[in-house]
């Protein structure tokens, strides 16, 4: 009886915590579809009484946003592929106990987690490499994340060495072992870290502001910020972007949040199984 009561209390607490996490996002979605009067009169909306697409029409009324979506998709796909390729190769090398200089290299990796190069030095390096106003400026400076690298390294390190020894007996070299044995066995970790990198690239904001001067190359996050600024009357007017009078600023902000968040949420269910397993194994074996 006591155990059942305890379980009910735990489930009740978890349900309440889940509602606290989910309700704000439901409010954001509902408010983005609500009418002007409802947004102004109500503080919290779960289901709009009258659906309105004015905010979304306003956001998608210009071709610029479609270009920005393509830019974000390109940066996310290419950036994730580059980051996973470089991170997995480096993590595999650091996971080998026979690697000469392994400890000093690991120290340098951990050091970058505590002390970064700084905004201005990084900008000067990007400028000297001729990457300003280039999509690669959004990818290469952050291609390897030290935290993600350590997770992959710990995962690779726990793969039984007997598998590698058997592969070597069969004539497999190091690259063959990596691509044919290590990577297939590491799909949960690969899926987890890929999602981490993809979310980071999709939310690219500060680096785009620093390195991109051409508005035609803006990713979706920067353009949505500009739409919010224009709609609130802080600078310019929307006629320059090919749109008429805007709906209320509150609904535009809510619609912007939905547009920026939904793509990531659509990807997550397809890798949920691998993501949960990879996160669990990383926490136990790390």
Curated annotation (Swiss-Prot):
Regions that span the bilayer: 9-29, 69-89, 106-126, 131-151, 176-196, 251-271
Cellular localisation: Cell membrane
UniProt keyword Lipid metabolism, yes or no: no
Domain of life: Bacteria
Membrane topology qualifier: Multi-pass membrane protein
GO annotations of cellular component type: plasma membrane
Keywords of the record: Cell membrane, Membrane, Sugar transport, Transmembrane, Transmembrane helix, Transport
ABC transmembrane type-1 domain boundaries: 69-271
This protein's record includes keyword Phosphoprotein: no
An example Gene Ontology biological process: transmembrane transport
InterPro entries registered for this protein in UniProt: MetI-like, MetI-like_sf
One Pfam family matching this protein: BPD_transp_1
Gene3D superfamilies: MetI-like
PANTHER family: ABC TRANSPORTER PERMEASE PROTEIN MG189-RELATED-RELATED, POLYGALACTURONAN_RHAMNOGALACTURONAN TRANSPORT SYSTEM PERMEASE PROTEIN YTCP
Protein function: Involved in pectin degradation. Part of the ABC transporter complex YtcQP-YteP involved in the uptake of polygalacturonan and rhamnogalacturonan type I. Responsible for the translocation of the substrate across the membrane.
Subunit structure: The complex is probably composed of two ATP-binding proteins (MsmX), two transmembrane proteins (YtcP and YteP) and a solute-binding protein (YtcQ).
Family per record: Belongs to the binding-protein-dependent transport system permease family. CysTW subfamily.
Protein name in the entry: Polygalacturonan/rhamnogalacturonan transport system permease protein YtcP
The species this protein was found in: Bacillus subtilis (strain 168)
Gene that encodes the chain: ytcP
